[in-house]
């Protein structure tokens, strides 16, 4: 049985930082705990997956970050906290949001998240003031929005891919994410 894991690497002569995370168990736990409908599960699962990698980017165990995504869509807000040890926790305002499909079998996460709003990351780096960065949502599909956040708010060109596959039985078949970042 595959277990959730996070891998970090420097590639291309240490010019690119790579994070890959498998989060199937984590996302299934969230679905069970909050009785998430598929679109809500995909939205929260993608955010939890990216957040776990962002937590791993923190420098010390005392640091943590909070992510809030609110596109004024039917799902409401997605709120996730991430810690340096890889632990994450989060919730969505409306776990029973009605599913929207792009085509049969393909969830339209952007439609339930919405795009009329922001993605905000607040980092508690154990200093007097927290660092906070906020960007307008690009697609509501989560990955694009985080890529835009890293590029704009942290001035780090970044590619983000994340996904949650809900099986025909309604349970999480697979979940994970990847972050590629250009280093200065």
Tell what function each PLM region has.
Residues 2-184:
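Interaction interfaces in information-processing and related assembly proteins
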């Amino acid at each position: 049985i595959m277990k959730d894991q996070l891998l970090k690497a420097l590639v291309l002569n240490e010019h690119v930082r790579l994070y890959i995370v498998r989060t199937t168990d984590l996302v299934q736990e969230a679905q069970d705990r909050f009785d998430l409908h598929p679109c809500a599960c995909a939205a929260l699962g993608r955010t939890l997956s990216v957040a776990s990698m962002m937590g791993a980017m923190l420098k010390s165990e005392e640091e943590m970050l909070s992510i809030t995504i609110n596109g004024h869509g039917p799902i409401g807000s997605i709120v996730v906290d991430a810690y340096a040890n890889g632990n994450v926790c989060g919730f969505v305002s409306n776990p029973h949001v009605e599913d929207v499909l792009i085509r049969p079998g393909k969830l339209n996460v952007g439609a339930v998240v919405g795009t009329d709003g922001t993605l905000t990351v607040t980092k508690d780096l154990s200093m007097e003031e927290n660092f906070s960065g906020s960007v307008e949502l690009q697609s509501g599909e989560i990955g694009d929005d985080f890529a835009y956040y890293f590029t704009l708010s942290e001035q780090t060109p970044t590619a983000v891919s994340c996904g949650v596959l809900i099986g025909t039985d309604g349970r999480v078949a697979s979940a994970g994410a990847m972050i590629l970042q250009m280093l200065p």
